[in-house]
Regions:
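Short amphipathic alpha-helical face segments that pack within enzyme cores
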Residues: 37-40, 72, 76-80, 97-98
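Short linear motifs in exposed loops
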Residues: 27, 72, 128-129
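Alpha-helix N-cap/loop-to-helix initiation residues
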Residues: 31-34, 67, 99
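DPxDG-like acidic metal-binding loop motif
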Residues: 58-90
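Oxyanion-binding and handling regions
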Residues: 1-20, 90-195
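Short glycine-/small-residue-rich flexible loop motifs, especially phosphate/cofactor-binding loops
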Residues: 43, 79, 153
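N-terminal beta-alpha supersecondary unit
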Residues: 1-61, 142-145
């Protein structure tokens, strides 16, 4: 089975494919060109791993908050495919839940350099922290930071950070993802359901 991972919540827009036991990730770069580059990225992954878009049966998305508006963009790609092929499965997870699966808390920066703090024990989904307040913020335990998030890593220098790869976490914590496949009425526009 071919699985596609769509990372819309970290600093770079990335696609990752898992075919059998082999993985490949590509960075699509400029978030402003994401929708135009997605098809090209999927095609490139397919050429490198010998599959075509119709063979992708599972889509995994980060739902934000984060750099590229999370749920809006993260689910737009697979739900467009879903409108044409309702047999695909769509899974999503809040970025904080995935990152926090590896540490006591997590920090993620968006493309504007804002920092978001997630703590497993807090009721709020996230707290926005100014860079100048990082040094005095009472972090607890280990802090998960995405591998490519240089803004968060720099701001947290000297703190107990754990660098994580979201594609690897998707594989490791698949059970944490929410299955949106049978809930299309909750996220698919009405006109698409009538096609």
């Amino acid at each position: 089975m071919i699985r596609l991972f769509i990372d819309t919540a970290t600093k770079t827009f990335a696609l990752g494919a898992r075919v059998d036991d082999k993985e490949k990730t590509i960075d699509l770069g400029n978030p402003k060109k994401v929708l135009e580059l997605t098809h090209v990225g999927i095609q490139k992954l397919g050429e490198e791993r010998n599959f075509t878009r119709p063979e992708i049966k599972e889509y995994y998305c980060l739902l934000g908050p984060g750099s590229n508006t999370g749920i809006r963009l993260g689910l737009t790609i697979p739900r467009t495919v879903y409108a044409m092929d309702p047999t695909i499965r769509i899974y999503g997870i809040e970025t904080r839940k995935l990152l926090s699966a590896e540490a006591d808390s997590a920090v993620l920066s968006d493309r504007n350099g804002n920092l978001f703090y997630f703590d497993k024990d807090r009721k709020e989904s996230h707290i926005r922290i100014r860079k100048e307040d990082i040094a005095s913020y009472p972090f607890k335990g280990t802090i998960a930071v995405e591998d490519s998030d240089s803004v968060s890593k720099e701001a947290l220098k000297g703190k107990n950070i754990v660098s994580v790869n979201v594609l690897s976490l998707r594989r490791k914590h698949k059970d944490l993802f929410i299955d949106f496949s049978d809930k299309e009425e909750e996220y698919l526009p009405e006109y698409a359901r009538k096609i």
